[in-house]
Amino acid sequence: MNKVTTKTLFEKKQKGEKITMITAYDYTFAKIFDSCSVDILLVGDSLGMVILGYDSTIPVTMDDMEHHVRAVSRGAKYSMVVADMPFLSYHTTIEEAVKNAGRLIRAGAYAVKMEGCDDVYDKIEAVIKAQIPVMGHLGLTPQSVNIFGGYDLRAKEEAEAKKLVEDAKKLEKAGVFAIVLEKVPSHVAKEVQRSLNVPVIGIGAGPYCDGQVLVCYDMLGMYEDFKPKFVKRYAEVGNMIKDAVTRYIEEVKKGEFPGKEHSY
C-alpha cells in the first residue's frame, strides 16, 4: 500500500471518499493506527493536555513536538504524519515560522498544521514557499483559547460564518493542502466544504466535511478531564486498563504471578 500524500487526499475528495485522521503521540499507537490504514496521523499539540497534563495546548514547546514527531514517524509506514506547530512557534517572524516548520519536517513529519488566517497569513505563505506542506485550521483554534475566553462553538452568527468561509478560501489561495474545521455548525462546515477544492476535515463540525479527526485518547475512552459533545467513544480502554492493572496487583500480592508459564 502506497504512503498517503497530498495528492492522495485531493483524489479522495474528488471521488467523494471520506478521509480519516486521528491523533498519535508515540510509536506504539502510531504503529497500531497505521496498521488500520488511517489516512493521517496528527501529532497534535493536544499532547499538552492528554500526555503532559497541562490544562491547554499553550505550554507545549517545539522541543515537545519534535520529540513526539520523531516517535510517531517511526511507526507510520502508510499514514501521512502531520505535526501541529505549537503556540508562538510561528507567530513572531516569518524566519522563525519557516525554521520551526523545518524542524518538524526534519523530525519526520510530512506536513505541519497552522492555526488561524489573517494574523499568520504571511507565515503560512512563507512556509509553503519553503516547500513545506501546510494544513490550515479554522473555527475554534485552541491556541487562541485565552482570546476566545473558552472552547465555545464558533461561527454561530452570520457575520462570523461568512468570515470563516472567506478565510478558508484565502488559505486555499495561499496553498494549504487541507483545512481542519473545529467546533462550527454543520451548515457552515457544509458551505466551506462546497466552496473549496482542498479537503475539509472536521472535528465537531458535522457530517458534511471531507473527513473527520478525533483525539485518540478521547475516542478510546482514556481521557476523563474533557468530554466534548462531538466525541464518540468507540471503546472504554481506560476502564480496561484499570481492570488489567487491578488484576495484576491482586495476583502479585497473592503470589499468583508469575506462574510456572512465566518463569524460566
Curated annotation (Swiss-Prot):
Cofactor info, note text: Binds 1 Mg(2+) ion per subunit.
Keywords: Cytoplasm, Magnesium, Metal-binding, Pantothenate biosynthesis, Transferase
Cofactor: Mg(2+)
Active site annotation, chain numbering: 182 (proton acceptor)
Enzyme class: transferase
Keyword Zinc on entry: no
GO MF term set: 3-methyl-2-oxobutanoate hydroxymethyltransferase activity; magnesium ion binding
Protein name: 3-methyl-2-oxobutanoate hydroxymethyltransferase
Taxonomic source organism: Caldicellulosiruptor bescii (strain ATCC BAA-1888 / DSM 6725 / KCTC 15123 / Z-1320)
